[in-house]
Amino acid sequence: MIMLIKVFVLLLVVYILHNSYKKYKKLDKNELKGPTPIPVLGNLHQLSSLPHRDLSKMTKDYGDIFRVWFADLYTVVISDPVLIRKIYVENHESFRDRPKIPSMKYGTYYHGTAASMGEDWVRNRGIVSSAMRKSNIKHIYEVINNQVDVLMSTMKKYEKRSEPFEPRYYMTKYTMAAMFKYIFNEDIGEDEDIHTGEIQKIMGPMNQVMEDFGTGSLFDVLEISQTFYLKWLELTEKNFPLLLKFFNGRYEQHLETIKPESPRDLLDILINEYGTNTHDDYLNIASTVLDFFFAGTDTSSTTLEYLFLMMANYPEIQDKVHQEVKSYLKQIGKDKVELNDRQSLPYVVAVIKETLRFKPVTPFGVPRSCVNEITIDEKYFIPKGAQVIINYPSIFENEKYFKNANQFDPSRFLQTTTTNTASNEESSFNSNLAFIPFSIGPRNCVGMQFAQDELFLAFANIVLNFTIKSVDGKKIDETISYGVTLKPKTRFKVLLEKRLI
């Protein structure tokens, strides 16, 4: 027994020494600055329940690009839009992969658009982009437009009854129903409860996955535990199998009824594009569909929830939006906003952009991995295998790019330049160029246009028809809750008052 203890202690000492050497050794003369790590944990002990805030504070000490250790995962944090473009656009080939960690591998095994790597990603991106181009634009518009009609009908019922309206519930239903129609050509009834109906079959497991993986796990980034952690997930995690079971039912139905020459929805198009010859084809289709649900519902619904919050807290801005929409529609003789009205409603677009900036939904986006060691601008060395993340809140709160960044001011997106208040000099960087909520480069959000259309149509028609007020006449709490997405901490409700159009 004593011998076993001695062996264990010896192995532990060797492990800690090896782990320390890895973290403390000099990599390159241009290696990035960063906080001093400790063995095993790296810099994890310096992160709180709001890690994006902690990393933003580190920016003040180490600059707009620095390194931290998430246990054994060397991570590069970037808060400079110029450097982001040099990395994600000019050197895209070196940063197109995802980190090889258990949570990224589990469930999809690097299939689909979000998790695939290398040439597999090139093929997947090409197929999905082609599939989306083949989706009839008119059909996509009708999908979103019909869901807006359903949403307006529901909100009118709440307004007539003078009942508080919960944005989170109904914005989730709106985005989920649009995705069901777009991908599966299925209609979700206006009266369907998202906690008991068809939506719940995918939303329940999705929410649990985001809750389980959203805050990260030490075992994910501790090299010694990664193999065991992946096996643990495969044996105990129940939600991804439920998601695949849900998808498989739709997939089998589509295989039985598909007419390749006249696809009904995105799933039909994906089946046509990928084929059904191998299990890899199936996994790519399944993973791509789930990618759309994960990326295209929670982020859009949360942004709409924030729009409700900001309109209730900033009634003067809400009135300005309403006046712009009402005046424009009166001029052209319509009573509803359509997609082709977007260019004529710049303030509506500016409010959506400012909400995405002021209340960013994703703190870091989906991380990238460095394929080969590289030096950016001859002074920023990034080693092979490094994880790369963008700290969006740090960029969006930076006075260098957004004057009076702590103020909710949509008019900034109606201007062409910003002023650097620190030096009182005009910034050479256009605020719109620093505004990258959907990431940039070849691996940016593939569903960006769909999301923008969803947001614009819903928001413009909501403010056209209703005045949004807090239930008690006070400002709604804007505190956030950290996870895969940054949501309002409180599931708030609002009162709706009918506007005269």
From Swiss-Prot:
Coiled-coil stretches noted in the UniProt entry, renumbered to this chain: none
Protein name from the UniProt record: Probable cytochrome P450 508A4
Primary location class: membrane
Membrane topology note: Single-pass membrane protein
Transmembrane segments: 1-21
Signal sequence interval, chain numbering: none
Similarity section: Belongs to the cytochrome P450 family.
